[in-house]
Amino acid sequence: MHFSLVLLVFAAIVIPICADTSTTKDYDDKKSLQTSNFGTAAVANMLHVLQSSDNSKRLLRMNDKAVISDHEEERSSLVKNKQKKLSYRIKKGWENVKKPFKKSAKIIEKPLKKGSKIIIEPFKKVSKIIKKFAIKGAKIVKKPFKKSARIIKKSFKNLN
């Protein structure tokens, strides 16, 4: 269709400049058209070919498909190029973002390593002290229960 429109526009602009009378032939159908104006003869001939000839219709369809496929190839290549550029920019930007964080992470890790030793040591000492008191307290707590358990056992024996 696009091809036929281009030919029609070409016929409307260029052909009126040519001679007044002409004879054009459609070699596919062996018919001749004779008109007084070369421009109208060309347009009539083209319309006749478009309407009657299956070969020309096939050629036009193939031309349209070729144009569409060319546009799709161009479009897909443009999309691929833009995706590559975008991914490249994202990688570069991400590297620029990561670098300061890596440096600051190292700066933060060093005091934390030193500070963790300072923080952990008192907890170790305190936990040892707590364990000692917990063991002593458990013994203190167990003793009355042992006594009461003995008393309860004796009372059950007396009941039987």
From Swiss-Prot:
Induction: Expression is up-regulated in spores. A motif (RxLR-dEER) lies at residues 58-75. Keywords: Host cell membrane, Host membrane, Host nucleus, Membrane, Secreted, Signal, Virulence. It is found in: Secreted; Host cell membrane; Host nucleus. Residues 1-19 form the signal peptide. GO terms for cellular component: extracellular region; host cell nucleus; host cell plasma membrane; membrane. Secreted effector that suppresses pattern-triggered immunity (PTI) in plant host. The RxLR-dEER motif acts to carry the protein into the host cell cytoplasm through binding to cell surface phosphatidylinositol-3-phosphate. Belongs to the RxLR effector family. This is Secreted RxLR effector protein RXLR-C11. It comes from Plasmopara halstedii. The gene is RXLR-C11.
